[in-house]
């Protein structure tokens, strides 16, 4: 696990769009139920790493309200730019293998189906 290349690295943008749509359909309900248990409040600053099509970033934006902020980060944010996201969502290009993340500035840092694609030596040096 984590040793193989990213499963969708060579997928076309349209195929990746469809793959991520399937993930949303399968996992968004349980994901938002679990996140809701955290008690996310208005004004929170949230970071979603590997935001894909932005469904969870969109949901988080509703939780944090207009005074909160959600950063939807992905190493290839083209798919994020294809969807309409609330004004309190900022799209950012981020590769967690090569770029540092200032996690202290966030109340919540979240990822789903991401860490399995990170090489183990990065997770456990």
Where are these regions (language model features)?
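Class I SAM-dependent methyltransferase SAM/SAH-binding core
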Residues: 47, 52-99
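A short acidic, Gly/Pro-enriched loop at the edge of an enzyme's catalytic core
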Residues: 98-108
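A short, conserved alpha-helix within the catalytic core of class I
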Residues: 118-125
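Hydrophobic adenine-recognition pocket in adenosine-nucleotide-binding enzymes
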Residues: 114
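Conserved alpha-helix/loop element of class I SAM-dependent methyltransferases that forms part
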Residues: 25-42, 59
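Class I SAM-dependent methyltransferase Rossmann-like catalytic core
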Residues: 3-28
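A short beta-strand submotif of the Rossmann-like class I SAM-dependent methyltransferase core
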Residues: 111
């Amino acid at each position: 696990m984590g040793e193989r290349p990213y499963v969708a690295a060579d997928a076309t943008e349209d195929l990746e769009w469809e793959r991520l749509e399937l993930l949303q359909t399968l996992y968004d309900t349980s994901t938002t139920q679990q996140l809701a248990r955290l008690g996310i409040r208005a004004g929170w600053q949230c970071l979603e790493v590997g935001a894909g099509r932005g469904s969870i970033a969109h949901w988080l934006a509703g939780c944090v309200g207009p005074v909160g902020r959600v950063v939807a980060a992905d190493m290839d944010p083209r798919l994020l730019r294809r969807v309409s996201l609330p004004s309190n969502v900022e799209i950012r290009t981020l590769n967690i293998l090569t770029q540092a993340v200032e996690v202290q500035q966030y109340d919540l840092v979240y990822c789903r189906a991401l860490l399995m694609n990170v090489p183990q030596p990065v997770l456990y040096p």
